[in-house]
């Protein structure tokens, strides 16, 4: 289909239409739960849900109070085969809503969203539409939190969709022509209301095409083989595009050094059956240490299905403390959870 004919990096440009779009900061964030259908830059309909912060926990901690004061929203990017209606994603939303307003959505090809999954490429456009929606609702600060495939998407989104300072020239180079990575450059020139103020990548891969674990070999079978795509469609409610990437999109580890000065938190479990620990360490090594933190969580498995409430609470607290803060050094060490 034409909606998946080229990579996301070449399509990130103005003109996105979202339900209820408006200029950031024109009104206070909504206090009413909302369900809507967003429209991405390439015309895919995305099922999205808005959950206001849980008022009963408004006084639980200082971070929640600060989040409410500056209008923070956390946008949740689920893993492959997930959707906003999955119990694990709902649980993440409920925990995060103790700290901030929350937007969940279903990636293309998942749940009630349209299109077909490109397994991390065009999904960046889905996330951008959700972030724009958050800002159109009045949120002055937005954090993104992604799990597994969603983790790769939040990394790429943060690198490719940047808030540009006032007066920044849009030329690709001194001569105004196309420089290295021109498709990524065009995406970074995308509308600034789609940028994020803090990034959390949980159980994210560093590299594409990883097949080093049995779990990932099963995932590749589901993606690349007709029988696997059939099982994914009817067994996992995930519709996968049959075409290979062309061109291959920017990988998470290539995106990592482009994220600063946006704060970045990488979270990974020492019992992850999909991506071993060299993946988070590769992301840490590639990212700017002044703006990056790594949490290695003992006993944690993979993504939202395995994330305990205590970890989700800490992630939400980190996001409320970092999003909206003026760029500064946050430390670059490794923290064992």
Language-model features: where?
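The serine-hydrolase catalytic nucleophile loop
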Residues: 80-93
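N-terminal cap/lid segment of alpha/beta-hydrolase-fold proteins
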Residues: 2-66
């Amino acid at each position: 289909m034409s909606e998946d004919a080229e990579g996301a990096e070449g399509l990130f440009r103005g003109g996105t239409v979202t339900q209820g779009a408006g200029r950031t900061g024109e009104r206070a964030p909504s206090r009413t739960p909302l369900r809507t259908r967003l429209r991405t830059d390439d015309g895919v309909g995305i099922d999205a849900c808005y959950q206001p912060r849980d008022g009963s926990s408004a006084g639980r901690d200082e971070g929640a109070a600060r989040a409410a004061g500056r209008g923070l929203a956390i946008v949740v990017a689920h893993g492959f085969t997930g959707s906003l209606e999955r119990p694990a994603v709902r649980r993440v939303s409920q925990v995060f809503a103790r700290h901030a307003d929350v937007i969940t959505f279903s990636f293309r090809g998942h749940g009630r969203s349209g299109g077909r999954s490109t397994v991390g490429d065009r999904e960046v456009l889905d996330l951008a539409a959700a972030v724009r929606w958050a800002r159109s609702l009045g949120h002055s600060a937005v954090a993104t939190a992604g799990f597994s495939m969603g983790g790769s998407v939040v990394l790429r989104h943060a690198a490719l969709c940047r808030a540009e300072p006032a007066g920044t020239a849009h030329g690709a180079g001194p001569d105004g022509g196309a420089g290295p990575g021109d498709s990524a450059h065009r995406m970074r020139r995308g509308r600034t209301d789609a940028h994020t103020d803090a990034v959390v990548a949980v159980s994210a891969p560093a590299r594409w095409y990883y097949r080093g674990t049995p779990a990932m070999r099963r995932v590749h079978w589901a993606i690349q083989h007709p029988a696997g795509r059939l099982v994914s469609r009817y067994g996992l409610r995930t519709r996968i595009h049959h075409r290979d990437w062309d061109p291959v999109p920017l990988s998470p580890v290539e995106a990592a050094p482009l994220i600063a000065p946006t704060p970045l938190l990488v979270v990974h479990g020492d019992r992850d059956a999909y991506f071993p620990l060299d993946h988070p360490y590769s992301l840490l090594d590639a990212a700017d240490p002044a703006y990056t933190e790594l949490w290695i969580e003992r006993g944690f498995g993979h993504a939202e299905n395995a994330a305990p409430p205590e970890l989700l609470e800490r992630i939400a607290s980190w996001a409320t403390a970092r999003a909206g803060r003026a760029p500064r050094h946050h430390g670059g060490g490794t923290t064992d959870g």
